[in-house]
């Protein structure tokens, strides 16, 4: 009986989230510097997308993989790995459909870096990471995700306490941007999108992940004790 109630609650929450997304008029959301909002207007592929652009669906196995890798690396930091002190706060990151939908809209532009606004009513300044892939042919979706995760995870060799403590609003010094955003104690949710296309003889892909905050940094203070999310503690004790 309990499992049935939990399933119904999760289904209701998901339906509510989709309804909220559909009800938002992104053209009316305020954006810094009069930037256009990625969610405003028609959802069409840009000219930069070349031939045969396609948005790939991220299945549950894909979203679970992304969340698992992000939360695993957050667990490592929470426990004081990589020579860093234990984090004072470290929430478990969850999947957010609105962030995912806006990430998908971004990938349909087929350009990694744009100045488009991606604010939502719940998240004022979402962070964003982009992974570009070019080869003779494209691998399966899971392989693309694994390649992006590996690229970010390798940045652990560049990370240090000095870099963590000297974070600035426009990002940290050093080649640690992807890993740093995933480690931010201000991040609580993520959503990703993936678009592929043909560029002459080359196959290309753009994987974009929007995070609930773009403010980088991890609270390394342990003076008041270690404060971890209960789910994070459960994961650490598994």
From Swiss-Prot:
UniProt keyword list: Cell adhesion impairing toxin, Hemostasis impairing toxin, Platelet aggregation inhibiting toxin, Secreted, Signal, Toxin
InterPro entries named among the record's database cross-references: CAP_dom, CAP_sf
MF (Gene Ontology): toxin activity
Pfam entry (one): CAP
Extent of motif Cell attachment site: 32-34
GO cellular component annotations of the record: extracellular region
Domain (SCP): residue spans on this chain: 67-211
Signal sequence residues: 1-23
Subcellular locations according to the entry: Secreted
Highest taxon of the lineage: Eukaryota
Predominant location: secreted
Tissue: Expressed in salivary glands.
Role of this protein: Inhibits platelet aggregation induced by all agonists tested (ADP, arachidonic acid, the thromboxane A2 analog U46619, thrombin, and snake venom snaclecs (TMVA that activates platelet through GPIB, and stejnulxin that specifically acts through GPVI (GP6))). May act by competing with fibrinogen for binding to glycoprotein IIb/IIIa (ITGA2B/ITGB3).
Family: Belongs to the CRISP family.
Record protein name field: Tabinhibitin 5
